[in-house]
Every structure is written in structure tokens, then in C-alpha cells.
Amino acid sequence: MSETSSNAIPAYLPLRNDLIGEEPYGAPQLDVPVCLNVNENPYAPEPAVVETIAQRVKEIAPTLNRYPDREHIELRKAFSTYLERESGVKLSVDQLWGANGSNEIMLQLFQAFGGPGRIALGCDPTYSMYPEYARDTFTTWKLAHRNADFTLDVDATIKAIEDVKPAMIVLTSPNNPTGTPLKPEDLKRVLEAARTAEVAGAAEGVHPVVVVDEAYIEFRDPGTPTALELIGEYENLAVSRTMSKAFAFAGARVGYLAANKGIIDCVRIVRMPYHLSAVTQAAALAAFEHTDEQLSRVAHLRETRNATSAWLKEQTYKGQPLEVAETQSNFILFGGHFDDRDRIFDELLKRGVLIRVVGPEGWMRVCMGTDEEMARFREALVEVLRIVEQG
């Protein structure tokens, strides 16, 4: 993997005025020995999984002259089976929808519920793509701020709902980039507020949709609830999931949405025709045949996260212990008082370790790798912090 040069848009092209000077989103993709910056599952699919995927794709290859099932019914059935097993929540095909990664799911939600004159509300710090979805759909993006420990400030969020009258409220659990879980009681308070809240520019009786992005939810501690459990109780709740993280399927680009049928039907209006290729559907169905294997490393990654959090808390920078955000994801936000995080990033990169400069000033994020990768990260970080301290 390598980085391409930055955008150089010719002046004669009629690029939208609001896009002039913008750069494409993307974390660095570099050829380094230890890549810990994009929150992937570091373990490749088992040979049996690879074999099944290859066989299922081979089986559908003779049909590639025809369009795929645009409603991807079999895949939606597989989502249902998986979620009942993983979360104990039974959902019908009508309550599920798939797309090319949860990025496309989120974009479809913004297309359906955002637009000119509409507002979407998030809670800062949060995933950096949300404002880009808003920009791309001409939706106004507003923020409520989190507490100092990155938990949701429910009172501030509810006040923002009342003040800005959003069509969408976007929450993330575990939150990216902090890893902070969303407490069920906090989510319920937001859902209750949204039930009666007004939407700017909409007719009376229209209320906002609450979207919970659960891209990293499989890494939560055992027994921690999921927002899926509330779908039957709240008709205004939509939950986004992905196969990219815990399920070790990032290269296939498969995300999915769980919600009541009304929300799914709204998304179906804006989806592109035949948006999920036959190859994608076949590969995803094959992966679900091996759910145990695909999730086999999650418990170990959770243990690695907990051990790494404890280790980071023992480290110091300029005489102060590192701050470490509470996390139930496969990544950790740490630092808190780094006064030159860009140099720390560069020095780590020189040693073959790639992490992420993201989140509030003074913080950095590292995702969990293999045991060997994490050992190299620890060794490099200790060395780099001492070097940067010396100026």
C-alpha cells in the first residue's frame, strides 16, 4: 500500500464551490511492518473460510452477466441469523438492510433524512466521516460536546436537540475515536427526547431519527447491552453495523442497518439500483458460514486491549502519567497531554509502527494488533516518548 499525492484539481473543472480545497478522506495507507491505525482485525481469515469464499464466488461466476438480487434477501436473512446469535435480538428481513460498508449505510441515512434545510446532530469528539456525509448531502452538521471523560453529556445533547431541531441524531457506541461505550440509560433518554422533538423545516408530527453506529460493538465487554435491544420499543431508532471490524472482513466492504421497516423503506428509496454486487453477496454469505472462525480472535483482542490500556497507564510523558480513555472497542485513545503528537507519530513511523493522530489535541489512537505487533508498539513508544521529551 502506498499513498498517492494530494489533490490537484484543475481550475477549469466546475467542482462544487463547497468542495474547493477539500481533500479525500483517508487514514494513511503505508507499507509498514506494524499497521495499527485503521482499527482492522489483524488476523487473516482461516484457510477454510478462504476456501468457502472462493467456492461460493465460483458458483455464482457463470451468472455475472445478470444483475444481482437488488434486495439481497439471502444476505438479509444471514444478518438476522447472526444478530440473533450475537445479541439475542430477533429481527425480520424487513428490519434489515445491507450496503457496501457501514459508510454507505450512513450515507444512505443522510440521503434519506438529511438534505438542504435539514440538520444532523453529533456529539464531539466523534467519527470524522459524519460531517463529510453531511457535506455531501447538503445537510447542516451540528455538535453537542461530550463530558471530559468522553461519556455522553445527556443534558447537553437533549438541549441541543431542542435548540437545533435535527432530523438525525448520530451517536456512536463504542465511540470512535475514544472507544467510550454508550450507556443504555443515556440512549433511552435521548430516544425519549427525540420522540417528541421537532424537526426544522418539517411538518408537525415529524420527529428525528436516532442513529447508533455500532461498528465496534462486538468488542464490548460480555454482558454489555446493544442498542438493537431497543428497536422493538423505539420506532425512531436505527442501528448501523459492519463486518469490517470484529468479523475480519474489511476488504469485502459489507455493512448493514437494523431498524423498523419504515426506516428501512426510507433508505431503500435512495439506494442505488443493484448496489451490492453478486460477488459481495456471495462472499459475505460464505463468511457467515464460518461465523465462529471469523470471530475467534475477538476475545483475545479484547484481552489485548485491556492489557495495553493498563500498560499505557503506567507510562509517562514529561513526568505525567499518560491518560487513557475508557474503551470497549479494539482501539485505545491515549496521551491527553502530548504537546507534539505529530512528532511522536513521525518517530513511531521511523520505527515501522503506524498509529493515528486523531481526536482532541494531545491525544493519539492505537488499534490492537497481533501479540508481536503490540510488543513492537510498546518497545517503540517507550523509546519515542523519551526522545520527544528531550526536544
UniProtKB/Swiss-Prot annotation:
GO terms for molecular function: histidinol-phosphate transaminase activity; pyridoxal phosphate binding. It catalyses: L-histidinol phosphate + 2-oxoglutarate = 3-(imidazol-4-yl)-2-oxopropyl phosphate + L-glutamate. The keyword Lipid metabolism does not apply. Its EC number is 2.6.1.9. The modification N6-(pyridoxal phosphate)lysine is found at residue 245. Pathway: Amino-acid biosynthesis; L-histidine biosynthesis; L-histidine from 5-phospho-alpha-D-ribose 1-diphosphate: step 7/9. Keywords: Amino-acid biosynthesis, Aminotransferase, Histidine biosynthesis, Pyridoxal phosphate, Transferase. Homodimer. This is Histidinol-phosphate aminotransferase. The gene is hisC.
